[in-house]
Amino acid sequence: MFYFEEVALNIADLLEHAVDAVPERIAVVCGDRRVTFAELEERANRLAHHLAAHGVGPGSHIGVYSRNSIEALESMIAAYKLRAIAVNVNYRYVHGELRYLFDNADLVALVHERQYSDKVAAVLPETPKLKHVVVVDDGSDGDYSSYGGVDYETALAEGSPERDFAERSADDIYILYTGGTTGYPKGVLWRHEDIWRALGGGINFVTGEYVPDEWTLAEQGKSGSLVRLPAAPLIHGAAQWAAFGALFTGSPVVFVPRFDAHEVWKAVQDNKVQVLTIVGDAMARPLIDAYREGDYDASSIVAVSSHAALFSQSVKQEFLSLLPHVVITDAIGSSESGFTGIGMVSKDSDHSAGPRVNFGKDAILVDDDGALVEPKPGAIGLIARRGHVPLGYYKDPAKTEKIFVEIDGKRYVVPGDYARYEEDLTVTLLGRGSQCVNTGGEKVYPEEVEGALKSHPDVFDALVIGIPDDRLGQRVAAVIQPRSGKELDVAALEAHVRTEIAGYKVPRSLWLAEEIGRSPSGKPDYPWAQRYASEHEPVTIQPA
């Protein structure tokens, strides 16, 4: 059982408490490798001391450029132990994007997998602040000799295993860079305590109140049996937060290096995973297909949770038909807000209501002018959250002023997502306002239309966009990925969608694509959809 003298409010302190409580328990599994909490800490300590010897200290920014791995997690922990800041680097970035991020984030050190050596070698001459590089051997043959990269295991061998770091603070900074699907990525600045609290740390989920003492908090880690697998990449908040949430309570985390549906089910089976965390339909649909194709034992799973993107109703029903013993949860939120609300269904739930969530006690809806929207059925507004919210965006005061606002004397974050109150005062997420299609004065939210399209059995994935229209200003359009081996009947699809949503929301122009463009975490890439539509002929155009 966990017994601490006081509640820790710093990520590194929370992890060290778990190490002290359950040192021999497995902490992280990745492929055929596994490390205990004690081993995870020793390796993170060694890396931290190595980095400190090369000038990294409090406030320094360290890039972590890696797919999911034990080393990626160790690198983040090492940074926090030094009161430094780990910065997530998207492994899909090309030269210009890497140059921008390395410069904007003020990186002074970098830990990267060897497969990215050529990209790092090309960008380093343009980022003079970045002085020290550590390279993880991933089995590739990238050459890092030209910039003096240090082998990761050599760095660990040079560093002390001792936990002899300076005292840390709840005010230490955690940064999460956004995906950048609407422009260049931005670093969201959180205090350590705020990110922990925003994820539910030290808070009673029923009452929303802080736990009264450390003993109550300790009960969360009593059994340590809740094995979690975050399938999203660690460059995404959904995976980072799921991993830290597990480790803080002494629970094991299982990774697959990259998303492969069959590998996920193998990892679930081999490690008796109990909570599978993914990002919406983009991951759920391949998992459903792979489960049907394979012969996997998923009896250990008690919950499948989606972070950052809601499951469509059709996907929930498919999951529950295959795994009737599980609970399906949707968590809404963003890099700027943490978790804002949660919805939960099981095989006995009413599935006719649509994807709804219950707001946390600090979430409200506001109108476009920042005024409170009265909680009544049908009312639509922007999601706003107060309490433990970020400090703002790194080096972007204008964007900070726009997103972080004062309402009735309290500071709120308003990331830009619209939602609607339902009859029972749950909320339906409508989507990001910047993606809203204004067609003849009617607002159409892409996520609602995408859900209707994906409920057709021959549609695997879809993105909905607005394209110019002489009469309506914009018309609703969609790029669709048909299910493999299926010949999509466009007329039948339109007829089906008309039974799901109002006629003005039905896409008038359709494009077919072999694969829908999404971020590594599964988030929709709407700029990709716009480019695809501009470069290809549609399969159908209906009168607007």
Language-model segments: residues:
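Structural core segment of the AMP-binding/adenylate-forming
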Residues: 53-54, 82-154
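AMP-binding/adenylate-forming catalytic domain of the ANL superfamily
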Residues: 136-137, 502-523, 542-544
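Conserved pre-ATP/AMP-binding loop-to-beta segment of ANL
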Residues: 24, 159-177, 183-184, 219-227
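Conserved AMP-binding A3 loop
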Residues: 36-38, 173-201, 205-208
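Conserved AMP-binding/adenylation subdomain of ANL enzymes
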Residues: 197-275
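Conserved AMP-binding/adenylate-forming
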Residues: 40, 251, 269, 302-427, ...
